Structure formats: C-alpha cells, structure tokens
Amino acid sequence: QRSEILLMALTGNQGKSGGGLRVAAWWELDGQRALWGGGSGPAWMTATEKLGLLYKAKIGGGLSWREFENLAVKSKEYRGGIPLMSFLYAHGGYKEIWDSPAFHDPALPRPTAAYMKEAVDKGWIPVRPLPGIDPKVYYFTGMNPLRRWPAPQIAQKHLWPKLAMIASVNTKLSTSSLMGDIVLPAAGWYERDLIKYTEAYIPYVVLNGKVVEPLGESKSEWEISGLLAKKIQERARARGVTTVRDAAMKGEVDLPPAYDKWTRDGKYRETDPRAALDEILLNSKLTGNKGYDEAAKTGVLPVVHAEGGPAPLWALGTRYRQGRTVFPHERFVLEKEAWPTYSGRQQFLIDHPWFEEAGEALPVHKEPPKAGGDHPLLLTGGHTRWSIHAIWRDSSLMLRLQRGEPVAYVSVKDARERNVADGDRIRVFSDVGEFEVMAKVGFSVRPGQVIVYHAWEPYQFKGWKGQQEPVAAPFKPLHMAGDYGQIHYRGIYSGPGHHPRAQRVNFARAGSV
C-alpha cells in the first residue's frame, strides 16, 4: 500500500475525484454520541483535559487530525480492545509457529519475540488480559474465529482449554458456535430494525426494516445485549458485587446499575430499538437530523453534510456535499491541513529504527516469506461469488451452482506433475497443517498457485479441517512499531494483522504419502 500511495502522489492523484487510496471508511453518525450521554469526555481524562476538549469542540473549531490521533493513542491505555494478533500471541499459543524465523522476512535481524517484548514494554501494543492472567470467557457476536483465524487448530489446542465459557451470538450454527458452549440465536435480516451499514463507498446511510417476527427463540442483538445487562445487574445486586476491574486494569466497572445505565434510566427498552435508532438519527447532522420513521419510508437516508474531520472510523478527510463524488484527502491536499504524520506531509521515508533495520525506510518490494515452510506452491484466495460470505456458504441452493463442496483450483501443469485429475480429492499441506479438498484443474490457474475461495466452513471439510489449517500467516513485526507520528496503534487503526495470502503449501492425491 505504501508503494500504491507513493505512485498516486507522484502522479498527482490524491485529494480529487477519482483519486486516492481508500481501504475502508465509514460515515460517522454523530448522533451515536448522544445515545449514551457521553458527557464532557472519557472518564480517564483529567478535569483540565476535559475542559480543553470541550473548548476545542465548542469554540476552537474542533480537534486537528494530529490532536485527535494523540488523544486516540493515549486512550488505548484505558480501553480493553487490543489487536487480535497480540492476543493470540500472548494467550492463544501462536508463539509456537510465529516465533519461527523461517516463516518471516529473512532481512529481519531479530526474532518476533524480541519485537513483541519491546512493543509491549514501551506501551506501543497492549495485551489484554495482562500477561500471566488467562482469559476465562470468550463472547463474540457474528464472528467465526475458527473459520477466519490462521491455523485455528492452534487456538483449539491452547486457547479453548483456558476458557471456562465460550458464548456466541449468531444467526446460524457456525463452526465456532458449534465448538462453543452457548449459542444465543440472533434474529436474521428483515427480522429486526437497525442501521445496516454506513460505509462511505456510497452517499447514503442504509437501514434495515423489520417485516417479520424472529424465528423461534432468536432475538435482535439489541435485545440480547439489553437482557444480558439486566441479568448482570440482577445477579450483581443479589450477590453483593459492587465494582470490578475493567479489562485494561486501569479503572472499575460499576455492575449494580448496569441495566439502568444501558436503558438511560428507562429511556430505552430492549424490546424496542426504535427509540434508540430515532435518537441516533435525529442527532445526526450527517443525514439532516431526520428521524427513524422518515428514514424507514425508503430504507436509506442521503448523506447531506460531512465536514470530513477526524473521528474513530472516518478516514476520508474530505468535506462532502450532495451532488459530489466521495473521495479521500481533499482537506489535506487542497485545503493544506497538516496530515497526521510525523512530518505533517505525505510521508514515504520512515526513519523509525525498526523500519531502517529491516531495510524498509522507503517502500520496497520483497518476496513473500516462506510462511508455512519451504514448499513450492503459493496458496491464495479470492472473494467467493456464490455466497457473498460464510452466511450462505452451506446453502444447498448456492452449492448447486458449483461442485457442491469445497474445491481448490490448481494449474494443469501442477496437477499433471502430481498425477491429479479434475475431480480428484487432494491433500493440501504445509508444515503447520493440512486439509482435504476436491481439485478443480483450471487452464487459467498460474503454475505454482493453489486457489481456494473464501468463506467455506471448516465443517464442510473432512474432519472439520478447513482451508486455514496450513496457513501460518505470521504478522509482520514492523506493524507493532510505535512512537513515530503516524506509526502507532490505537483502536481501529494500524496494529499487527494476519494476511493469509501467498502461504507456502504443496498438494498430493489424497491417500498418497
């Protein structure tokens, strides 16, 4: 991405319609701040800091991008959220594969463990729970970690036994739900009222209207969270529990009034989300302060006004008005606002010690590391065209449009060398794991490549060993660097991630050695 952005800068394709690199950005519904009555600032701020924040918001024209980033970086010390990779490294047992130097960039002069220790010691990357304290409860909504995480067998071996409770909120029995303890069935599409998504690829906020009642015992996530808050309050009062330490171990959470706070002292009810949705929309300048009933008439609200200032999910930096296309970074390029970088400009030289010792102070091409072992083929993927995501990947109707089961696309040359014909079952393997799948020999597949499209559930494979089993996907240690302008971690920004592309594998006919 650094190289792509450099190319755009060199060709003058930043800050104008049709230009710029945008991976993901969301319209900020400013009314969400009013939902819980956020007050004058986060609880961890001093009175002086809260006063300064209030002045900036009301009189000083708002925070600059750099001021916002500085505040967001500081807030990570007080929040429970952390990057997934540091959690799996510390608590999931992934050290056993990610510490292997053979799986990483050979230019790195130090092992992953050394980078992790320095990043944690310097406060660049948080680890929650703190090292030495095992996680006890894993509660996830809509997620499917045993399908998405690299080498999920590692998590099942090391993380799952530590957990006293695994609870899933889901619309279907995903692999992860089936491998958990409790499934709270969630209402499906058109069985609940909600704001569906606010991604800034289109100039609209999209809603989802309830037209039928939820099936069986399923409930909306709104109702589920409200009922959990009610039960937590009930049990805390019955047991005489007052406060508990928060996830960051920096503050306390008051449990006896949990439900009262959730409902804003009765303002909202878990059985009716419309009051909350109405408050969000009525307080959102973004969509013209129109309420939910008006929005529900068409199912969408046009975006009418966006200043493009800093916000947790906002990554465009462009003032939007109706009739314009949506594109990023106008405020930095045309209005000359300082970029939130070390230099205040578009910056491609990163003279951070970690980047320098890895030979990446400037954008540079490197071949994919031999993650998974020294094998001759690269496992890649793509976005499935048949099911959109895992939610419909096991639909009998969708499966009729293809082979009816998971398939791996392999080249004619690689198949011939391994005595594999179209439709044969093959074993795709690395040093980390393996899975069995049907081979689909394709003339358009490049030799040296194995393609498995995403979203297959592990339970659709033999022995529940899915396509992620041989994927080591070690994170890049440089992504834990901090204390250098734009190079830092905070919620929904930067941090180490797994990239399960170009992973080293081989394949053979199933049953062969």
Walk through the language-model features, giving the residues of each.
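Accessory structured domains or lobes within enzymes
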Residues: 1, 152, 158, 162, ...
